[in-house]
Amino acid sequence: MKLTYVPVKIARSITLLVTSPVESSLRAQTAGWLLRRAQEAEAVVFVEWDGDVPRLETAGGELSVDGAMALTAWLALDNGVPMGETWDFPLALNGGALSLPCAVTPVNTCCVVTVTMPRAEVTDFSPSDGLTLPLVRYPGIAYLIAPTGAVQRTAAADLLRQWSRQLSAPAVSLLFWNEGARSFDPLSWSKATGSAVWRRSCAGGAAAVGDWLRGRAGQSVSLNQPGGAMAVTLGEAGAVTVTAAAEVGSGRTVDLVF
């Protein structure tokens, strides 16, 4: 089976956007195969078409903000959006269960993409005696925020797998937060692929930290990650947007072999 995908780099984190059709029953296996084959990649998403309308699909129905940015940037270039012009449209995800308002502006060698997040649920998570972590939930994903020293990094992947069962989420990310530097290191776990991946950056994680900081930060905050900074805007009535630059690479075709 021939498989075509496009690598998209967002703050040095590479998402593979699969543009050829893949049956839903094969997406998890395909994503796992690509992550093993392209070791520089950190996430895999799929584009499906309902007539002329694109839709973002993920391996396990999880929310992928980086995937939304990748598809938005690719569509802008594929549709010839002029340099400096902003294109706004709602992007459907996972069978249309969710729609994310997206805006994209091609500039120089990249596209600046802004995604408006769904409303978050911000609570606490107490997986064991003596440990309580901030928890930010969006439809299809949960983010745990670990202040410096709260969780040992060497044990993080195993803990994340364990906690994901307690949280009953298709994807869970653990964000190692440094308050003084306003920075975090993201570790993402996916139930569909069964893998935990250290990320250079995570757009959804940036939005989650922004939601958590609401009331303690201004209307906008720049959050640093290993791959670079992302801008988060905190609007009224709980609105949150995250903005980052996306670099769309050349399409590649491989023979998919399980």
Show which residues each predicted segment covers:
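A glycine-rich beta-to-alpha transition motif near the start of alpha/beta enzyme domains, typified by
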Residues: 1-110, 144-258
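Surface-exposed beta-loop interaction hotspot
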Residues: 107-157
